Amino acid sequence: MIAKIVQNRPHHCYIRSMQNYLPSLKQMQYLVALHEHGHFGRAADACNVTQSTLSAGIRELETLLGQTLVERTRRVVRFTMLGNAIVEKAHRVLREAEELADMAAAAAAPLVGELRMSVIPTIAPFLLPGLLPRLRKERPSLKLFLREEPSAQACESLHHGAVDCVLLALPYACGDVEAETLFDDALFVAFPGDQAEELPAMVSADQIDPAQMLMLEDGHCLKDHALAACNRPELRAGARMMGTSLHTLVQMVDNGLGITMLPQMAIEAGILDHTDIDTRPLDSEHDWRTIALVWRKGSPRADEFKMLADIFRKHKAN
């Protein structure tokens, strides 16, 4: 009889009865911030509250759940096993809550308000300087917040809800995402200027000396795209992975320390200005990377991201 009565209660009554022991979004925000920063003071600053407010909110959450989530000492903040599991769940809950608000905002007016986007370092300095003024002109009410980070971190930021979309290069395994491809970006081999007379019109992978190849450090997908385009296993083993940025690699090549691979967008943006470097197209079946905008699968802002992708394509076409 009791079970039958509970089942027949209106759903809104059931929700009201749970409100006394459901964690609040604010409490989950505090917990996630503490996990991210590992320090009560820095977490409080990130949440724009006092340290005592954040600490009290997390204690209230622990009391509510009847479990210790954080072990506190003078020097160390250590999460319990349950605490770590709840942080992962809280990430998803907060992301869903943000998407709920985004859904309403997008229905009212697309590409208005805040949009957080990660851009990988081999795209950001070459595409954004020309793109952002156009975006500001076409969508003056859009408040775009940018993060520059390598592909792995960018995809992690996306799935944790720290950003809404990512501008990156494919192929790259970014998890359960939707993508709008924007354009193909050809790859060129860059040589010191004193080698120009010896170079053919196009360079095949067989003509590249692995000992001379300079690559970006691990974590940059351009390195993988360049090696895949060459399709020579010995290049992966012999290439010197030394550069932290394309600008660093350019300076190394200009000083005769080796050769490297550069994307067309970087060359068009003037990365070789004031150098003696010469470039040649790579003679390969897949001598390009594909620039794309990706977002979480099922995002309520998918239509907005497609509109954003169209703006990016128009900018490239012009």
Give a label for each model feature:
Residues P150-V163, L168-A169, G219-D278:
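Hydrophobic hinge/microswitch elements
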Residues V32-T53, R74:
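Short helix-boundary/capping micro-motifs
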Residues V6, S24-L25, R75, M81, ...:
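Interdomain hinge and pocket-entrance segments immediately C-terminal to HTH DNA-binding domains
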Residues V112-G175, G243:
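Central regulatory/effector-binding core of bacterial HTH transcription factors
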Residues C174-M213:
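Flexible hinge/capping segments at coil-to-helix
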Residues L127, I277-N318:
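A late-sequence structural motif
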Residues E197, V203, Q212-P233, R301-A309:
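Secondary-structure junction motif
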Residues E62-N84:
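A short LG(V/I)-centered, amphipathic sequence patch enriched
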